[in-house]
């Protein structure tokens, strides 16, 4: 009887397919749970994004807004499914899943399957990636456009099949990214740097490839002209896209923010996000990857990573809140560091299976510690760290739980939180009225949010019939006043 080899076992032959599938399901589940439960609320930045979506209309002035593709996608979800915590965050969740798929194919092109799986496992459980992936803010667009740009550029440079499709896709991605502040700078910098490296330059200007860029260039030019026209109609859009007014020239304060964000080991909150955004193990692997990629900087891959890294770091010095713009290069460097660590160990014992097995055990333990540590830090941090928990408004879900869309009542809220309730009135609760000052007399039932409860005078004629609460500090979220004492 012929002895069965390990390579003949079904699970072994399909191990990478099972690994990729498991990772995909793991990340989709993690990002949806994050959107609904951890942190389970809306930051002020997310509420401000809803405000922009509320004021969209299909006139020239109405669509002259930054991050237009995101707002259009959010508006589509509001039209189809109404306004809820999930529909507000749905565009970010979808773009996050699409970004993770793009990163998977990018890493698969650059690394061995084992390195790809381990790197994606770390990425999928990193607090920063999970946080940005569930946050309905501009952060996810920086990750999305970065992942697609690097993927399509890699497919073109590696002469993948259907090269014309990847060129057109790169042109569309580049054009749409111009709706996001500061991406003009990244795109322009990458184009200039591409001409400095012989390999990308060959694919851009050689006679053999010039004609293949005609259609992509036309698409990029057309969308660019449309954005230019919108900027001509709305000077505010132009200044927002350029981003000069948002830069901070207090270099010392900016460097301190970056120190808190990446290096300082004690937890704090910077821009609604718990820092440091990566643990010490990940930073060590990134440092190793940085060193290894510098040794091979002449290669197209290392040149691309370092180019993006330098451009992003130059921007972060003046705008330290733009951490999402550097997250993809950092994860690629982490993969480089992980691959280097494995190669270094296997290089020490090329023919000793026991030593190689021991190294595999140690590396597996490192990955497990990073995955479990990242998951617990994210979940426990946004559930129990007081400074972080207080940054997120969970009142929308609470109000929907305790009312019906056919109810008629007045809702007294602050101007800061008003956008989510205006969206709710527009798409779900058509019978309610949103007010910002307390009425003199009670007409219909009045709901008063926690933020403006002090506006209700003690001599108010209405009767406080009940209070809607949650299980957090300052849990008195809505005060309900009626005209009688039923």
Question: Model segments located where?
Answer:
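Start-transfer (signal-anchor) and selected internal transmembrane alpha helices
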Residues: 1-32, 197-222
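Membrane-interface transmembrane helices that cradle and orient dolichyl/undecaprenyl
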Residues: 109-113, 149-169, 176-177
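Aromatic/acidic, Gly/Pro-rich catalytic loop(s) in extracytoplasmic/lumenal soluble domains
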Residues: 433-486
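Signature aromatic-anchored transmembrane alpha helix within multi-pass, membrane-resident enzymes
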Residues: 338-377
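Hydrophobic/aromatic-rich transmembrane helices and adjacent perimembrane loops
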Residues: 132-133, 139, 285, 302-350
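Transmembrane-helix motifs of polytopic, lipid-linked glycan transferases
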Residues: 90-110, 148, 287-291
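Extracytoplasmic catalytic/substrate-binding loops of multi-pass membrane glycan-assembly enzymes
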Residues: 34-52, 61-74, 83-86, 384-392
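Transmembrane-lumen/periplasm boundary regions of multi-pass, lipid-linked membrane glycan transferases
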Residues: 38, 42, 49-52, 80, ...
């Amino acid at each position: 009887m012929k002895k069965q080899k390990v390579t003949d076992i079904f699970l072994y032959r399909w191990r990478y397919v099972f690994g990729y599938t498991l990772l995909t399901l793991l990340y989709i589940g993690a990002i949806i749970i994050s959107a609904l439960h951890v942190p389970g609320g809306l930051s002020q930045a997310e509420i401000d994004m809803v405000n922009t979506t509320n004021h969209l209309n299909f006139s020239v002035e109405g669509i002259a807004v930054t991050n237009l593709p995101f707002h259009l996608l959010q508006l589509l979800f509001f039209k189809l499914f109404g306004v809820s915590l999930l529909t507000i965050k749905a565009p970010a969740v979808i773009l996050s899943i699409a970004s993770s798929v793009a990163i998977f194919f990018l890493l698969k092109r650059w690394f061995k399957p084992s390195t790809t799986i381990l790197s994606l496992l770390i990425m999928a459980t990193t607090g920063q990636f999970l946080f940005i992936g569930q946050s309905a803010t501009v952060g996810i667009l920086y990750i999305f456009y970065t992942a697609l740009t690097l993927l399509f550029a890699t497919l073109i440079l590696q002469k993948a099949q259907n090269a014309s499709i990847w060129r057109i896709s790169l042109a569309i991605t580049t054009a749409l990214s111009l709706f996001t502040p500061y991406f003009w700078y990244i795109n322009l910098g990458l184009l200039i740097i591409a001409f400095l490296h012989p390999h990308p330059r060959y694919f851009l200007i050689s006679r053999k490839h010039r004609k293949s860029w005609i259609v992509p260039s036309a698409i990029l030019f057309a969308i660019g002209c449309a954005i230019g026209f919108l900027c001509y109609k709305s000077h505010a859009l132009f200044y927002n896209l350029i981003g000069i007014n948002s830069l901070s020239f207090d270099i010392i304060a900016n460097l301190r923010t970056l120190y808190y964000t990446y290096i300082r080991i004690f937890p704090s909150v910077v821009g609604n996000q718990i820092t440091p955004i990566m643990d010490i193990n990940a930073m060590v692997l990134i440092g190793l990857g940085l060193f290894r990629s510098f040794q091979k900087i002449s290669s197209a891959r290392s040149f691309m990573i370092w180019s993006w890294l330098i451009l992003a770091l130059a921007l972060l010095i003046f705008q330290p809140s733009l951490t999402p713009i550097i997250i993809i290069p950092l994860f690629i460097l982490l993969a480089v560091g992980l691959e280097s660590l494995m190669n270094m160990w296997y290089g020490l014992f090329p023919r000793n299976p026991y030593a190689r097995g021991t190294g595999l055990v140690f590396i597996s333990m490192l990955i497990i510690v990073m995955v479990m540590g990242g998951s617990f830090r994210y979940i426990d941090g946004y559930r129990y760290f007081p400074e972080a928990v207080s940054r997120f408004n969970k009142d929308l879900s609470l109000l929907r739980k305790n009312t019906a869309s056919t109810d008629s009542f007045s809702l007294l809220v602050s101007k800061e939180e008003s956008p989510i309730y205006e969206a709710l009135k527009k798409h779900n609760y058509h019978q309610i009225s949103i007010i910002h000052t307390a009425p003199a007399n009670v007409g219909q039932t009045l709901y008063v949010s926690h933020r403006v409860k002090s506006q209700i005078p003690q001599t108010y004629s209405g009767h406080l019939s009940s209070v809607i609460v949650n299980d957090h500090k300052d849990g008195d979220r809505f005060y309900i006043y009626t005209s009688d004492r039923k």
